[in-house]
């Protein structure tokens, strides 16, 4: 019997299931566990290779007949903000995002619940309990944290924190070459503020301030309206069979 060192990743393939993005398609994923002393290094390598993280799992699409899911990352230093994106930043100038430890809180879950019910009522996460949410946030062996967005208060310029309940939240991994937005959610009743776009713009600024070259956005899915927004942050690089390809 061949033995494998505990730190050597083992990869597995899921059974086919309905694709959540493209009607009539089936998805399969290849995945491995991010555990042990090499979890952080493995997450770095796999993210650069097009994997995404969910708790202690790293996965990427391995569909048999479709290649629509494409990993994308924004080129931070060269990012060219558009007029509409600049207006979104101005519209949300009253918000401040604070990095916090990846610890769940009841006010986060309340916002998460409202977001799911309003935006993804037919999705696979809709039945997540408060315990499920806590595991999504806490269950990690990599360098990760929350960025919690609240309204600015009179003392926010002093202590860097907002006031009141969270308006938006992003679970963010810190990599050697960038930030990775693992999962984000926001107040569904504030649609006019374009909070999803705002958080991406804010994370581009955060990556630039840290001297990191990329912001990883996950998968852009050609043909899916849900994922069209990811193509609007340019220049970006898309992971193709020949490697990362720049798109202006």
Swiss-Prot record:
Domain of life: Bacteria
One Gene Ontology cellular component: cytoplasm
Family note: Belongs to the R-transferase family. Bpt subfamily.
EC number: 2.3.2.29
Task of the protein: Functions in the N-end rule pathway of protein degradation where it conjugates Leu from its aminoacyl-tRNA to the N-termini of proteins containing an N-terminal aspartate or glutamate.
Stored SUPFAM superfamilies: Acyl-CoA N-acyltransferases (Nat)
Annotated localization: Cytoplasm
Species this chain originates from: Methylorubrum populi (strain ATCC BAA-705 / NCIMB 13946 / BJ001) (Methylobacterium populi)
Reactions listed under catalytic activity: N-terminal L-glutamyl-[protein] + L-leucyl-tRNA(Leu) = N-terminal L-leucyl-L-glutamyl-[protein] + tRNA(Leu) + H(+); N-terminal L-aspartyl-[protein] + L-leucyl-tRNA(Leu) = N-terminal L-leucyl-L-aspartyl-[protein] + tRNA(Leu) + H(+)
Enzyme class label: transferase
GO molecular function (one): leucyl-tRNA--protein transferase activity
Protein name: Aspartate/glutamate leucyltransferase
A single BP term in Gene Ontology: ubiquitin-dependent protein catabolic process via the N-end rule pathway
């Amino acid at each position: 019997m061949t033995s494998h060192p505990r730190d050597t990743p083992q990869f597995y393939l899921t059974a086919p299931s309905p694709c959540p993005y493209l009607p009539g398609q089936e998805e399969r994923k290849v995945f491995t566990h991010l555990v042990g002393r090499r979890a952080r290094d493995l997450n770095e390598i796999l993210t650069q290779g097009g994997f995404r993280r969910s708790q202690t799992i790293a996965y990427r699409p391995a569909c048999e007949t479709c290649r629509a899911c494409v990993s994308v990352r924004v080129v931070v230093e060269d990012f060219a903000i558009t007029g509409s994106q600049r207006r979104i930043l101005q519209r949300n100038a009253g918000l401040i995002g604070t990095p916090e430890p990846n610890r769940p809180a009841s006010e986060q879950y309340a916002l998460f619940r409202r977001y799911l019910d309003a935006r993804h009522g037919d999705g696979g996460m809709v039945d997540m309990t408060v315990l499920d949410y806590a595991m999504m946030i806490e269950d990690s062996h990599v360098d990760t944290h929350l960025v919690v967005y609240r309204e600015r208060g009179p003392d926010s310029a002093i202590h860097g924190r907002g006031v009141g309940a969270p308006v938006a939240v992003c679970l963010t991994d810190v990599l050697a070459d960038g930030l990775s937005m693992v999962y984000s959610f926001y107040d569904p009743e504030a649609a006019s503020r374009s909070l999803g776009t705002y958080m991406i713009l804010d994370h581009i600024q955060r990556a630039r301030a840290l001297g990191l070259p990329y912001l990883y956005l996950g998968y852009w899915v050609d043909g899916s309206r849900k994922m069209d927004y990811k193509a609007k942050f340019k220049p970006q690089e898309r992971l193709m069979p020949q490697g990362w390809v720049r798109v202006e």
